[in-house]
Amino acid sequence: MSSGYKPDILWSPHHADRYVICDTELSLYRIGPSGSSETKAGALQLSEETAATLLAINSDTPFMKCVAWYPKHEPECLLAVGHTNGRVVLTSLGQSHNSKSKDLAGKEFVPKHARQCNTLAWNPVDSNWLAAGLDKHRADFSVLIWDISSKFSPEAVPAEKVRLSGDADSGLLVTKPLYELGQNDACLSLCWLPRDHQKLLLAGMHRNLAIFDLRNTSQKTFVNTKAIQGVTVDPHFQDRVASYFEGQVAIWDLRKFEKPVFTLNEQPKPLTKVAWCPTRMGLLATLTRDSNIIRLYDMQHTPMPFGDEVEPTIMERGVQPCSESIISSFAWHPSAQNRMVVVSPSRVMNDFTLFERISLAWSSTTSLMWACGRHLYECAEDSGQAAEAEKDIATKMRERAQSRYGHDTVQVWRNHVLAGGDDPQLRSLWYTLHFMKQYTENVEQKQQSNKQSLIYSGIKNIVKSSSGTTETRRCWSGSDRQTDVPRFHSEERSLALQLCGWISQGPDTDVEPFLKSLEQEGEWERAAAVALFNLDIRRAIQILNKGASSEKGDLNLNVVAMALSGYTDEKNSLWREMCSSLRLQLKKPYLCIMFAFLTSEPGAYDGVLYESRVAVRDRVAFACMFLNDAQLPRYIDKLTNEMKEAGNLEGILLTGLTKDGVDLMESYVDRTGDVQTASFCMLKGSPGEVLKDPRVQCWIENYRNLLDAWRFWHKRAEFDIHRSKLDPSSKPLAQVFVSCNFCGKSISYSCSAMPHQGRGFSQYGVSGSPTKSKVTSCPGCRKPLPRCALCLMNMGTPVSSCPGTGKADEKADLTRDKKLAQFNNWFTWCHNCRHGGHAGHMLSWFRDHSECPVSACTCKCMQLDTTGNLVPSDSV
């Protein structure tokens, strides 16, 4: 540590609460909490929480140039002080006469020729060794290593050059150093290398850094550089050294000492101090002359390819401990993380802690963790009802994947229940796909292939193909008024009503089954509206009365039923006038559209068609019944565009699984991020050209990647199987073939051409039935296949049990399953050592072993795969 007339700080290496300020004198301070019993009345306030108390002063060092604190616990508070005349004096602060430092305090180490002492460094292991770096002298060495336990040698130096003063004790003078290095040069800075305490790193005036080994001082390793000031070793990376010249810092790696690893950005002013943080790896602090800012360089370690010389990432920032005061020096706290004390030229001190850079990390399961200093924090998600409603879409998709959402291909509508059953858009989507599937199966039975493709094209395309529409007029059922209401019928409109779920398949167009299902679900208002739209006002009143008397019914439904019973078709009646004005005040949308229908003119049903709170399927079904061939396509087109822009899944009923459906689903994914629903939906019945759409492929691949990230490998395999059934073109080609070692032909290809044998890998080693032959040799050249490393049987022989476990409960009869695709009989081998065998045997072996089962082979087969030791999340 260099001093001068500007204050410098030196922290005790073993006392976390003591430090020394040195300029023209040495002042020992103790730092502690403000207001504590140890803090005296005259303490200096360093921060809002800490204050410093002066313990001792030593004013006997007027020509002090540098100071170094003794590295061991005992003797306590022993310091070496280098002077401008080259002498090194040992002194202590605040010690009693009985302390161990009594014999060493006052001891002086005198060079042959007087010149300035620039730097001092204690050996961290042999603590009796003290290295001093001096200015150049043509007849003397610049680096002297003193042994503080050595005695005075009167014959070594003339007496007139030994004595410091007339009354000095000659027993305290040492003039013969233990080692002398660096002849005809100057030493500006030096440090001991922690990795080898016999080595010393010197920085000399001849612009070189040199490493000396005290066991052979005639040999040295050196490199030419201008950065020869302030050499210091990173305490957490002992091969990394920092040095500086003027405003530039060089970082060295002692293992590759030819040139600096990298240099930091040059500062406009000369540097005065550089120091590594003792509590944080790779954090370097620098200070420039006449500055109030300390610059910090955080050196990050990033993985890099072998052989590439890539500089590490450095994050630079500046801190300003004092608002306006110039900083003379600073010192890191030896144990408190990111804490330092700074001092100004007027000895004003400030204690502060740096804010740590925070690193955030999201896991694939949406858990959040962040690191701050030495602490790791995990963010726990609130499990309350509000948090349940605000779950991230990734969390929802993960939970749905665990419930096998999307995989029910028989009762397709149940998929919305697997998703939680609380999303009306998902409910509408899966019911739409369910009705499409039902009608498709009915068409297949009737062998009407021309209609099969029309079903999944959506109501928009179905309506456009409508022909032969007939208009009928029907009277109200259950009303005294015999007003005729016009309705429209066609085969395509009936198909649309079936897809909306209003009527069932077949010639019967009765809505009564649909009304009963709505009553069972407690949707009284919706059921009454559907009955009213089918011109059965008495049934609507009956449903409302039943709903009012139910356990959770609304008594106001009786009032609505009473209002319906007074229906009249007279345009100027009081009933019609009051219903038109008061219906908008009704909070329930289905009650509102009921009165809108009753008070509207034929063909002008905007109050029903554009009520956004009503389900799309009900509005579309109403339109198919009451709009003519000119009005219906216009309305469907307008509603389709609204659904596409909003990304509303109810619009799949209109678009179908077509390009318009992909556009709608794209808006939905952009809004929600739900690639899971998008993938399953598009696989249900889309034509080949839609499945080849890059957007659809992107959703599917992203969902597969999500399953892999969640370690749902079994579920991803299920999804791939599900996908290959619905989209045969997605089945990937075989990527691995087993070829014969003798003839080189593919065994699987040869076997696939053999009659009565099945295809591919599946038949190897599976007995199947007595009539099936075993494939234990190459079908091409009849040479035997390799042997299993454990059972020593030729591959193709069926496995019986898994040897190597030694536990009866772990053994299994692997031949009880007679399927040809039994996994335990498959070939498996290590890509490194090429040894292998039956998959079942290999799995059993590597449960208890890490090395290859072949004798004399030390290959760690299972550990070569980074995922070899991972456990699927869906099997935990």
From Swiss-Prot:
<dbReference type="InterPro" id="IPR036322">
    <property type="entry name" value="WD40_repeat_dom_sf"/>
</dbReference>
<dbReference type="GO" id="GO:0005765">
    <property type="term" value="C:lysosomal membrane"/>
</dbReference>
<comment type="similarity">
    <text>Belongs to the WD repeat mio family.</text>
</comment>
<feature type="binding site">
    <location>
        <position position="830"/>
    </location>
    <ligand>
        <name>Zn(2+) 3</name>
    </ligand>
</feature>
<feature type="repeat" description="WD 1">
    <location>
        <begin position="59"/>
        <end position="101"/>
    </location>
</feature>
<dbReference type="Pfam" id="PF17034">
    <property type="entry name" value="zinc_ribbon_16"/>
</dbReference>
<feature type="repeat" description="WD 3">
    <location>
        <begin position="182"/>
        <end position="222"/>
    </location>
</feature>
<dbReference type="GO" id="GO:0031669">
    <property type="term" value="P:cellular response to nutrient levels"/>
</dbReference>
<keyword id="KW-0458">Lysosome</keyword>
<comment type="function">
    <text>As a component of the GATOR2 complex, functions as an activator of the amino acid-sensing branch of the mTORC1 signaling pathway. The GATOR2 complex indirectly activates mTORC1 through the inhibition of the GATOR1 subcomplex. GATOR2 probably acts as an E3 ubiquitin-protein ligase toward GATOR1. In the presence of abundant amino acids, the GATOR2 complex mediates ubiquitination of the NPRL2 core component of the GATOR1 complex, leading to GATOR1 inactivation. In the absence of amino acids, GATOR2 is inhibited, activating the GATOR1 complex.</text>
</comment>
<feature type="repeat" description="WD 6">
    <location>
        <begin position="400"/>
        <end position="440"/>
    </location>
</feature>
<keyword id="KW-0472">Membrane</keyword>
<dbReference type="GO" id="GO:0034198">
    <property type="term" value="P:cellular response to amino acid starvation"/>
</dbReference>
<protein>
    <recommendedName>
        <fullName>GATOR2 complex protein MIOS</fullName>
    </recommendedName>
</protein>
<feature type="zinc finger region" description="RING-type; atypical">
    <location>
        <begin position="785"/>
        <end position="866"/>
    </location>
</feature>
<dbReference type="InterPro" id="IPR031488">
    <property type="entry name" value="Zn_ribbon_mio"/>
</dbReference>
<keyword id="KW-0479">Metal-binding</keyword>
<feature type="binding site">
    <location>
        <position position="861"/>
    </location>
    <ligand>
        <name>Zn(2+) 3</name>
    </ligand>
</feature>
<feature type="repeat" description="WD 5">
    <location>
        <begin position="266"/>
        <end position="307"/>
    </location>
</feature>
<keyword id="KW-0853">WD repeat</keyword>
<dbReference type="GO" id="GO:1904263">
    <property type="term" value="P:positive regulation of TORC1 signaling"/>
</dbReference>
<dbReference type="GO" id="GO:0060841">
    <property type="term" value="P:venous blood vessel development"/>
</dbReference>
<dbReference type="Pfam" id="PF21719">
    <property type="entry name" value="MIOS_a-sol"/>
</dbReference>
<feature type="binding site">
    <location>
        <position position="791"/>
    </location>
    <ligand>
        <name>Zn(2+) 2</name>
    </ligand>
</feature>
<keyword id="KW-0677">Repeat</keyword>
<feature type="binding site">
    <location>
        <position position="740"/>
    </location>
    <ligand>
        <name>Zn(2+) 1</name>
    </ligand>
</feature>
<feature type="binding site">
    <location>
        <position position="833"/>
    </location>
    <ligand>
        <name>Zn(2+) 4</name>
    </ligand>
</feature>
<feature type="repeat" description="WD 2">
    <location>
        <begin position="112"/>
        <end position="156"/>
    </location>
</feature>
<feature type="binding site">
    <location>
        <position position="835"/>
    </location>
    <ligand>
        <name>Zn(2+) 4</name>
    </ligand>
</feature>
<dbReference type="GO" id="GO:0005737">
    <property type="term" value="C:cytoplasm"/>
</dbReference>
<feature type="zinc finger region" description="C4-type">
    <location>
        <begin position="738"/>
        <end position="784"/>
    </location>
</feature>
<dbReference type="GO" id="GO:0061700">
    <property type="term" value="C:GATOR2 complex"/>
</dbReference>
<keyword id="KW-0863">Zinc-finger</keyword>
<dbReference type="InterPro" id="IPR015943">
    <property type="entry name" value="WD40/YVTN_repeat-like_dom_sf"/>
</dbReference>
<comment type="subunit">
    <text>Component of the GATOR2 subcomplex, composed of MIOS, SEC13, SEH1L, WDR24 and WDR59. The GATOR2 complex interacts with CASTOR1 and CASTOR2; the interaction is negatively regulated by arginine. The GATOR2 complex interacts with SESN1, SESN2 and SESN3; the interaction is negatively regulated by amino acids. Interacts with SAR1; the interaction is direct, disrupted by leucine and mediates the interaction of SAR1 with the GATOR2 complex to negatively regulate the TORC1 signaling upon leucine deprivation.</text>
</comment>
<feature type="binding site">
    <location>
        <position position="778"/>
    </location>
    <ligand>
        <name>Zn(2+) 1</name>
    </ligand>
</feature>
<dbReference type="InterPro" id="IPR001680">
    <property type="entry name" value="WD40_rpt"/>
</dbReference>
<dbReference type="GO" id="GO:0008270">
    <property type="term" value="F:zinc ion binding"/>
</dbReference>
<dbReference type="InterPro" id="IPR049092">
    <property type="entry name" value="MIOS_a-sol"/>
</dbReference>
<feature type="binding site">
    <location>
        <position position="781"/>
    </location>
    <ligand>
        <name>Zn(2+) 1</name>
    </ligand>
</feature>
<feature type="binding site">
    <location>
        <position position="852"/>
    </location>
    <ligand>
        <name>Zn(2+) 4</name>
    </ligand>
</feature>
<feature type="binding site">
    <location>
        <position position="833"/>
    </location>
    <ligand>
        <name>Zn(2+) 3</name>
    </ligand>
</feature>
